[in-house]
């Protein structure tokens, strides 16, 4: 295993199905001058709450891009629901959020002030995807958020429903069938 599972294999885990892609979304105030990962240097950036997937992803992205949290003016830990207000009140320059799209938090930020979605691209990102197979290249659709008309490249993962291998097959089948028979309600 890797990360918190390092040295402790989890042979009893089984994936039932993938649900939706979750993308790393890096949102900056338009006036912050952030157009790329390198532009985060010297900025106040919310990296995600401690222990979150967003925080782990951003720390890995920064490391791969040759940046440390010390290179930022501030590495913030603002609650998700407070991110749009903090960004628009200029208490931070950018925030990261791993999420599916469309997302109401991101819509609040885009409607509260002039924002841009920062592309997560470049040689460092290529190396990250090559060395961490659970990340993939993806994009945030254009037209979903105010001010973002074209797709924005980034990386992401897939949300997967995982169960114990001890779960009886008929129960696993029942869960899968219930979700897919009622997929519109499941969303």
Question: What spans do the regions from the language model cover?
Answer:
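Pocket-lining segment of extracytoplasmic ligand-binding domains
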Residues: 3, 32, 69-168
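Short, solvent-exposed amphipathic alpha-helical segments in soluble enzyme
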Residues: 62-64, 112, 177-181
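Short helix-capping segments at alpha-helix termini
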Residues: 8, 65-71
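Periplasmic-binding protein-like
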Residues: 181-187
